[in-house]
Amino acid sequence: MTSNLAGNTNTAQDSDRPMIQMLSPEGKRVRSGEYDSYAADLTGEDMMEFYRDMVLIRRVDAEGNALQRQGQLGLWAPLKGQEAAQIGLGRALREQDFVFPTYREHGLAWCRGVEPETLLGMFRGQHHGGWDPQENRFHTYTIVIGSQVLHATGYAMGVKFDGDVATGDLDRDTISVACMGDGATSQGDVSEGLNFAAVFHAPVLFFIQNNQFAISEPNSAQMAAPLFKRGTGFGVPGVRVDGNDVLAMYSVAKASADSIRAGLGPMLIEAFTYRMGAHTTADDPTKYRSDALTESWLEKDPIDRVRRFLHHEDYADQKFFDEIDEEADALAARIRAACMAMEPPAPSEMFDSVFVEKHPLIEAEQREYLEYLDSFAEEGAL
């Protein structure tokens, strides 16, 4: 059977439940029943902001990719194609919510106030994170596949124990978000997180960006059932959303977050999307997927979809689009200059953030390491 989005045979995505879509690839509004009310208050200006977010973060992504190819970054994990999934979710969250990302959540980082330059610094090796997770309510990037799901679940359990959910106070009730890709769902950590979340009724949203490939493995080689059903056996209800539709992502994420915030337990969203670029800059996607498949997804580009909608509804004129392009150019120049100006960190800094408080053993190791470095200077002086 052929998926209505992927354009390729993929039995893992066959389902008797339709995918939630609110904007067609042509930019036309699609009614979605239960989720329409969550989009009712959105204005043309809101849709223009969605467009701006996606254009700017795509430009950040392009610069990150280019900087790595030029030897300025050690690695980069491209986001292109997944902007709607991340921006839609990011703009649906509240300030107190806590996001636990993987290494590709540049759009969510943007929504949580993490500066693009800071992301570049991490991939440049200038620091190990560079932002305060508590300030941004956004954990540092997680490289170990699936481990962040346990962190998000544990955090949500703590939120419940502290009484910060189901109080009726929208500025207090808190959820956590466990981000992952389709490949991560094969990790045992994800199953453990789902089980603990369900058993302890933890306020956590499991957010799966199904971009069709776990590095080089297609969905058909990973799973025999659609991912939105993955939580069912654990007691975690799920929904599948057109991940290239920012309006659907926003509405479903807001509905799910409201339900979790009200104390109704964890939920799961599968954002059905496509990674247009490589898994990372260490990868060559032409080795495992066809150009025809990628071309079919270009027709569903998340940014073009919103642009068509804004045109169709007369919300934006050419001047608006030109101004966004100019802003993207300025952003690209800014972050490129910032990246090129970054100085290597002092070697001793790796000891500074091991523990919250100073620890005598760490301090001793730092002293020994500094003495070791000084010995080279002494030898050079001789």
Predicted ranges, named:
Residues 27, 104, 243:
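Residues that form or immediately flank small-molecule/cofactor binding pockets and catalytic motifs
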Residues 59-62, 66-202, 218-228, 233-235:
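Cofactor-binding active-site loop characterized by glycine-rich and histidine/acidic residues
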Residues 17-18, 37, 62, 70-71, ...:
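Residue-level signal for pocket-adjacent positions within structured domains
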Residues 103, 271-273, 354:
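A general secondary-structure junction signal
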Residues 11-13, 89-92, 258-260:
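A general structural signal for short secondary-structure junctions and capping/turn motifs
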Residues 1-84, 277, 286, 291-382:
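Conserved acidic/glycine
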Residues 146-344:
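Glycine-rich ThDP/TPP pyrophosphate-binding loop and its adjacent helix/strand module
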